[in-house]
């Protein structure tokens, strides 16, 4: 085994199967790139990202763990989000929630 190597079963892996999904259009109104990580509470991302923020409360990006999406200045794109699961409690980030969703 090589350090950091991941061994998986043959075939394609499906991530987040059965999770509640939401697709939103996001635009970077700022003058610098903004990168959002896989588990960041999307509701609390940089205010320069413009989208239907209230609709995204309790959601994160539907991407592979440990990866991110980068929004260049002036760029607009659609992203798919998935709902947080488990106890649905959020702490940290921009400190907008600090508890139950």
From Swiss-Prot:
<keyword id="KW-0963">Cytoplasm</keyword>
<dbReference type="InterPro" id="IPR036461">
    <property type="entry name" value="Urease_betasu_sf"/>
</dbReference>
<comment type="pathway">
    <text>Nitrogen metabolism; urea degradation; CO(2) and NH(3) from urea (urease route): step 1/1.</text>
</comment>
<comment type="similarity">
    <text>Belongs to the urease beta subunit family.</text>
</comment>
<dbReference type="InterPro" id="IPR002019">
    <property type="entry name" value="Urease_beta-like"/>
</dbReference>
<dbReference type="GO" id="GO:0035550">
    <property type="term" value="C:urease complex"/>
</dbReference>
<comment type="subunit">
    <text>Heterotrimer of UreA (gamma), UreB (beta) and UreC (alpha) subunits. Three heterotrimers associate to form the active enzyme.</text>
</comment>
<dbReference type="Pfam" id="PF00699">
    <property type="entry name" value="Urease_beta"/>
</dbReference>
<keyword id="KW-0378">Hydrolase</keyword>
<dbReference type="GO" id="GO:0043419">
    <property type="term" value="P:urea catabolic process"/>
</dbReference>
<dbReference type="GO" id="GO:0009039">
    <property type="term" value="F:urease activity"/>
</dbReference>
<protein>
    <recommendedName>
        <fullName>Urease subunit beta</fullName>
        <ecNumber>3.5.1.5</ecNumber>
    </recommendedName>
</protein>
<dbReference type="InterPro" id="IPR050069">
    <property type="entry name" value="Urease_subunit"/>
</dbReference>
């Amino acid at each position: 085994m090589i350090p950091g190597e991941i061994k998986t079963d043959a075939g394609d892996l499906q991530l987040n199967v059965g999770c509640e999904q939401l697709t939103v259009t996001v635009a970077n109104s700022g003058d610098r790139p903004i990168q959002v990580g896989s588990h960041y509470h999307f509701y609390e991302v940089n205010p320069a990202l413009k989208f239907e923020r209230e609709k995204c409360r309790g959601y994160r990006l539907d991407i592979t763990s440990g990866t991110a999406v980068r929004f260049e200045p002036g760029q607009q794109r659609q992203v798919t989000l998935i709902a947080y699961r488990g106890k649905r409690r959020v702490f940290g980030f921009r400190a907008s929630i600090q508890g139950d969703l």
